[in-house]
Amino acid sequence: MELYQLTIHELQNKIRQGGVTSTAIVNSVFGRIDAVEENVHSYITLMRESALEEAQKADEQIRTGEINALTGIPVALKDIYCTRGVRTTCGSLILDNFIPPYDATVVVKLREAGAVFTGKTNMDEFAMGSSTETSYYGFTRNPWDLERIPGGSSGGSAAAVAADECIAALGSDTGGSIRQPAALCGVVGMKPTYGRVSRFGLIAFASSLDQIGPFTKDVEDCAILLNVIAGYDLRDSTSVPVDVPDYRDYLNRGIEGWTVGIPKEYFIEGIDPEVRGAIEQAIRTVEGLGARCREISLPHTDYCVAVYYIIAPAEASSNLARYDGVKYGFRAADCRDLLDMYKKTRSAGFGTEVKRRVMLGTYSLSSGYYDAYYKKASQVRGLIKRDFEEALKDCNVILTPTTPTPAFTIGEKTDDPMQMYLSDIFTISANLAGIPGISVPCGYTQSGLPVGIQFLAGHFEEGKLLQIASAYERNAHIEKRRPIL
């Protein structure tokens, strides 16, 4: 087995035993990138030179016995985090030449833990999309079928982990942008509780929904990464001062005696039969571990998509108002005056989907429509949150499909925004409620496409998610396949 195929914890063991160097690991990963990146297109910007320098520093630390949580481990970053001295585009022309003067908090934490950054991964422009097709830099392909999408908006990170172009990666999740691509690419992806991980240095899409989380090859690696990135940050006003446990302590506890809720509203017409079959088998596996699965109701589920597509665009229209070509980023040429520069810069700098959502959000916030749309959506959001609070009083966790279908073909839904928006129908609710969720591989379709199962828990109960995800992963006996590239 090649080094690039291993997990964080497997590489950690080899490093501690003196059997491998960080330089060898990084060279192995970049060798893999050289072999498959042309087909997959996971990255916008590669950081090869700095990665090799960081690997050499890591090897010096290893020789002195100074080994941290991620020393020498190659990690990819979604191109939505500010990285000092490294271009950060958010998948958009309007930030094509933007080089931040500072690092996001998660970047600082990963660096302090010893991680080696391989590059900045592709994404839907400003995280607005479910397929990584709206990126200014071209679409990413699903490693399992190069004619299909990897999911979005963090499709580049998910594809990079699935294709072994990194050992792990970070993404962001506003309505499912970690969990959905994780499911479609056959990897583990977690959205932590809102406020668990600092958003300082994350380029905002919808500030009350965005959350940063990991993509990994297994659940143990997810716990390792979460240990590093979680925690309170004074620089983020939405960060919550809650103690961070050692998440690896939850991995071997089992779930005997647990109650697992199965929301009836998530098993609706339109779910692909093979996805339904994989989820039903997963439920049987969970029951075999000593848990009791019972049907529950989340009565306001039908409103989730509508509420999300009022609140998220409204917040986006405000957040994206800062991109005007004045101080940084793309600036249109041949402008008559300041207003003309604003208009031409934003018209040319933003893609179609971003402009669609900005216009939608501006409309819902406008005078005469605020009460009818944004205020009402915010009220229904409160009801959705209460649904989860009531359900989780009687359940340890909730189990659902991550996506209604496997990965669809490239271009299949680009002309039908509503169909694209429905790709996140099972993931949006967790963002609206602010609760954590994790997607874990639970099988494959007959054509070999991955299927994911989602677990949801109460606020700051990531430990429970890792506990059931780890128990399921160990006992489901899902065949360990790798995409052929």
From Swiss-Prot:
UniProt keyword Protein biosynthesis, yes or no: yes
Reactions the enzyme catalyzes: L-glutamyl-tRNA(Gln) + L-glutamine + ATP + H2O = L-glutaminyl-tRNA(Gln) + L-glutamate + ADP + phosphate + H(+)
Xref: InterPro entries: Amidase, Amidase_CS, Amidase_dom, AS_sf, GatA
Annotated keywords: ATP-binding, Ligase, Nucleotide-binding, Protein biosynthesis
Pfam families: Amidase
Cellular-component GO terms for this entry: glutamyl-tRNA(Gln) amidotransferase complex
EC identifiers of the protein: 6.3.5.7
Keyword Ligase listed: yes
Top-rank EC class of the record's enzyme: ligase
GO biological process annotation, one example: translation
GO terms, molecular function: ATP binding; glutaminyl-tRNA synthase (glutamine-hydrolyzing) activity
Record-annotated active site: K78 (charge relay system), S153 (charge relay system), S177 (acyl-ester intermediate)
Role description: Allows the formation of correctly charged Gln-tRNA(Gln) through the transamidation of misacylated Glu-tRNA(Gln) in organisms which lack glutaminyl-tRNA synthetase. The reaction takes place in the presence of glutamine and ATP through an activated gamma-phospho-Glu-tRNA(Gln).
Xref: PANTHER family: GLUTAMYL-TRNA(GLN) AMIDOTRANSFERASE SUBUNIT A, TRANSAMIDASE
Subunit structure and binding partners: Heterotrimer of A, B and C subunits.
Protein family (similarity comment): Belongs to the amidase family. GatA subfamily.
NCBIfam families, sorted: gatA
Name of the protein this chain belongs to: Glutamyl-tRNA(Gln) amidotransferase subunit A
Protein's organism: Syntrophus aciditrophicus (strain SB)
Gene name of the encoded protein: gatA
